[in-house]
Amino acid sequence: MNSFAMLFPGQGSQYKNMLSSFFQKKNNLFKKIFDEASEYVNYNLLNLIKNGAKKKRDDYKYIQSAILTSSIAIYQLWKEKNGRRPALMSGHSLGEYSALVCANAIKFSDALKIVKLRSKLMQKIIINKPSLVQAIIGLDKVIIKNICLQYLPKIVSIASINSDDQIIISGEKLAVREVGLKCKKKGAKYVIKLNINTPIHSQLMKPVSEQIKYLLKSIKIKSPQIPVINNVDVICEKNEKKIKKALVRQFYSTVRWKEIIDLIKSKKIFTMLEIGPNKILSNLIKKNDNITVLNTNNLKNFLIAFKTIH
């Protein structure tokens, strides 16, 4: 098996009772990692992923921490089994923090601090300004961008370019809805509302990004031991200050996911392993005929991936 890349998912990859097959095997490693994370965020994350939150606001507040912890637990199991080291890592949005933890650039506890604040700031934004996130399927990004610009000064941003035919838009609720309708008239195959209640990667997030910047000043980030392709510049940054600046910008900038996958392919890496509780990134990538896509959303697929990559 040649080199492979590890990919880490972001918000939206959660579902009730995720990772259940890992816990059915009485995996002490998973319990230990979830207990550790729960202590840091002062909330029972294990109960959250098993049963869901009793209060909706708790789900919004802690689900990002749960997704981060899920990826870290799966990666630690991979390491415990002496799994092969990837040539590259990258994470989609929130997943960039998972990648940096697994590359030994950020301590897990520090990543939880950042993600907890990230969640809090996202919720703060929607109190005064209802938001919406939609996927536009089958329409050129230039057309979508031009439609978004027509709605200024209302804010609708391209949140993520996931592939040639899947663009995510985010921003003020009514404006996003109108942009979606206009995209449909211009030829989009589908316009799909996503299960995300905050205006991710839109200019609405820029005013609160200073708080992320302030927190990052107190956090040590080392040069990643495994190269991590970042979301905003599509490069493997090594410098602490530059990594921090990119993380602040990521809060309100477009996730350039298609370019990240193209960069990985340009390095002659055609095997990609998703480390997380779902198959969202795998489903995005599998349309590439020349790429082998593996995932770890359950224990069976984890073991298949482990065997394939070895």
UniProtKB/Swiss-Prot annotation:
It is an enzyme of class 2 (transferase). Pathway: Lipid metabolism; fatty acid biosynthesis. Belongs to the FabD family. It comes from the Bacteria. It comes from Buchnera aphidicola subsp. Schizaphis graminum (strain Sg). Its EC number is 2.3.1.39. The keyword Lipid biosynthesis applies. The keyword NAD does not apply. Gene3D superfamilies: Malonyl-CoA ACP transacylase, ACP-binding, Malonyl-Coenzyme A Acyl Carrier Protein, domain 2. One of its GO terms (molecular function) is [acyl-carrier-protein] S-malonyltransferase activity. This is Malonyl CoA-acyl carrier protein transacylase. It catalyses: holo-[ACP] + malonyl-CoA = malonyl-[ACP] + CoA.
